[in-house]
């Protein structure tokens, strides 16, 4: 989740992101910065941009547009990370959680799109919240096990009993 937090800051606390995502989001900026990133899935595979009214301005998964809202995709607990990361205009914060999505378990991070440079203007009355997520696929969990030298690390059903385990719960 820490890598996702760090990546969120790279994609959201960025002068170019303010220019490209406020007002009407620039389609080419969205494609090159977010759609393409979800298509590779290296850093994140899902992204949503939400405006100050709670409307999704884009919804992306694996390089394609999602036909569902962020709230429907992540479920009721999603409101918690939006609230936790909500700050006054220009102030950066981030919150995260694990969610059961239609595509499986995902770690998601939410926070406002803000400038990196002091004094860089943010359009008055607007707010953009960027949400990025990475799904815990079997391949991804296997790679984590190899990276951290944890033999046989894998996802298991909730009723699977093992000597060593970590429970991921979506309240």
Set out the residue ranges of the language-model regions:
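Short, surface-exposed beta-strand-loop junctions and turns on beta-sheet-rich folds
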Residues: 64-65, 114-116
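Short acidic/glycine-rich beta-turn/loop cap or linker motifs at sensory/regulatory domain boundaries
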Residues: 50-55
């Amino acid at each position: 989740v820490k890598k996702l937090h760090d990546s969120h800051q790279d994609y959201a606390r960025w002068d170019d992101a303010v220019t490209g995502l406020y007002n009407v989001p620039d389609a080419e900026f969205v494609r090159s910065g977010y759609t393409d990133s979800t298509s590779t899935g290296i850093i994140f595979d899902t992204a949503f941009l939400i405006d100050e009214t709670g409307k999704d301005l884009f919804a992306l998964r694996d390089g394609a547009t999602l036909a569902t809202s962020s709230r429907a995709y992540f479920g009721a607990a999603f409101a918690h990370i939006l609230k936790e990361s909500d700050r006054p205009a220009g102030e950066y914060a981030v919150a995260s959680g694990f969610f059961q999505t239609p595509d499986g378990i995902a770690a998601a991070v939410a926070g406002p799109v803000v400038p990196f440079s002091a004094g860089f203007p943010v359009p008055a009355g607007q707010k953009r919240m960027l949400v990025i997520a990475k799904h815990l696929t079997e391949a991804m969990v296997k790679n984590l096990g190899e990276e951290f030298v944890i033999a046989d690390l894998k996802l298991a059903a909730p009723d699977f009993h093992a000597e060593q385990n970590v429970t991921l719960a979506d309240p």
